[in-house]
């Protein structure tokens, strides 16, 4: 992921356009140079922040692996969220924390973590994952309407089947078979043929027929 971000930043450095014509050519070239310099400084600062955030994430993972006190892990997570709220590392750490809280059946805490991710991270994949996990957390609490609302989060087409399938789960839990069948069917239709989730999804469909 870090390598991908660095490649994207390098590409973004070349995305500036200036039309330089007539007697304004020299002035525009100077403005372009200044603008490019400022943009490069901004990008370098962003790259530095991403590296710092990744270091905090690595520290969190290490503490978790070493079974450090939860208070220490939570302190590192808060530091990451406050200092680098829009970084991929902050989103990853918060998703990990949500999973831990879910496993411990602290659903309200997991819910808060996932809502934080949705509010602070705009990456399409992470948005889809957070929305899906939030739907599952709310389903576990039988907050069906809230779960469906979370699963209505706009996502890219590639990730839509994930939310559709979970919507089907919510409807199935309410014994609303027709709605569940509809969402399972739409998810299966949009899911790639080689997806590892197709078999399980087909089983869900068949169980309702």
UniProtKB/Swiss-Prot annotation:
Periplasmic membrane side: 43-209
Transmembrane intervals: 24-42
GO MF: protein-containing complex binding
Name this polypeptide is given: Ancillary SecYEG translocon subunit
Recorded topology in the membrane: Single-pass type II membrane protein
Known partners and oligomeric status: Interacts with the SecYEG translocon. Forms a complex with PpiD.
Repeat region (TPR), residues: 161-194
Stretches assigned to the Cytoplasmic side: 1-23
């Amino acid at each position: 992921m870090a390598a991908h971000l660095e490649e994207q930043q390098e590409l973004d450095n070349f995305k500036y356009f200036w039309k330089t014509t007539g007697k304004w050519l020299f002035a525009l070239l100077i403005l372009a140079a200044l603008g490019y310099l400022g943009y490069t400084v901004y990008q370098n600062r962003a790259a530095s922040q991403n590296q710092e955030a990744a270091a905090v994430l690595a520290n969190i993972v290490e503490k978790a692996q070493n079974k450090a006190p939860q208070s220490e892990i939570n302190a590192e997570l808060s530091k990451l969220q406050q200092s680098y709220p829009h970084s991929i590392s902050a989103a990853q750490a918060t998703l990990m924390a949500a999973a831990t809280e879910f496993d411990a059946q602290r659903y309200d805490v997991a819910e808060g973590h996932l809502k934080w991710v949705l509010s602070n991270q705009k990456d399409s994949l992470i948005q889809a994952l957070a929305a899906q996990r939030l739907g599952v957390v709310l389903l576990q609490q039988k907050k069906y309407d809230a779960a469906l609302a979370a699963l209505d989060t706009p996502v890219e087409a590639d990730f839509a089947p994930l939310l559709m399938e979970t919507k089907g789960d919510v409807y199935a839990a309410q014994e609303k078979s027709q709605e569940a069948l509809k969402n399972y069917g739409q998810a299966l239709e949009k899911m790639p043929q080689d997806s590892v989730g197709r078999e399980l999804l087909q089983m869900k469909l068949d169980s309702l027929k």
